[in-house]
Amino acid sequence: MASNKVVFSVLLLAVVSVLAATATMAEYHHQDQVVYTPAPLCQPGMGYPMYPLPRCRALVKRQCVGRGTAAAAEQVRRDCCRQLAAVDDSWCRCEAISHMLGGIYRELGAPDVGHPMSEVFRGCRRGDLERAAASLPAFCNVDIPNGGGGVCYWLARSGY
């Protein structure tokens, strides 16, 4: 009798554990894709600076139009990579880059969303700017925990 109670208790515990794990995983899956969400502290002024990654802004703009001397570009790249690595929480890096992109759009008077082929500034299309920004973690060889080969998750979500 006691062994039946033990077996029943173990089975009940196993079922409850599986149900809890399934409910937790369902929160992070959407249409058979894992959805990576940044930590709640990944906000301007908390997980990264209010004006994030100023040297990365310059680098992304340079990459988009393909201009600049090699020496100047190398210094900007080093500075950008240092700033990106300084974002302590690796979960916050893509969020900081996304916020940086929004800042670039505001500075240029462009809407935050638009067609990838639309020109954001002379010689630079929105899609090219966003690809350059999203690939900064891979370019700088800094960790982002989304398993996307160093490319920020929101680029894959945007469809280009």
Swiss-Prot record:
Could you tell me which InterPro entries the record lists for this protein? Allergen/amylase_inhib_rice (IPR002411), Allergen/soft/tryp_amyl_inhib (IPR006106), Allergen/tryp_amyl_inhib_CS (IPR006105), Bifun_inhib/LTP/seed_sf (IPR036312), Bifunc_inhib/LTP/seed_store (IPR016140)
GO cellular component, alphabetical, reads:
extracellular region
Entry's SMART domains? AAI (SM00499)
Q: Give an example GO molecular function.
A: serine-type endopeptidase inhibitor activity
**Which key words tag this protein in UniProt?**
Allergen, Disulfide bond, Secreted, Seed storage protein, Signal, Storage protein
> What modifications does the entry list under PTM / processing?
Five disulfide bonds are present.
Highest taxon above the source species? Eukaryota
| UniProt cross-references to SUPFAM superfamilies, sorted A to Z | Bifunctional inhibitor/lipid-transfer protein/seed storage 2S albumin
Cystine crosslinks:
C42-C92, C56-C80, C64-C124, C81-C140, C94-C152
Q: Which Pfam families match?
A: Tryp_alpha_amyl
Major localization listed first in the record, in broad terms:
secreted
Q: Where in the cell is it found?
A: Secreted
The UniProt entry's coiled-coil ranges are none
Signal peptide positions are 1-26
Q: What does this protein do?
A: Seed storage protein.
The text of the family note is: Belongs to the protease inhibitor I6 (cereal trypsin/alpha-amylase inhibitor) family.
Protein name per the record: Seed allergenic protein RA5
From which lineage does this chain's organism come? Answer: Eukaryota, Viridiplantae, Streptophyta, Embryophyta, Tracheophyta
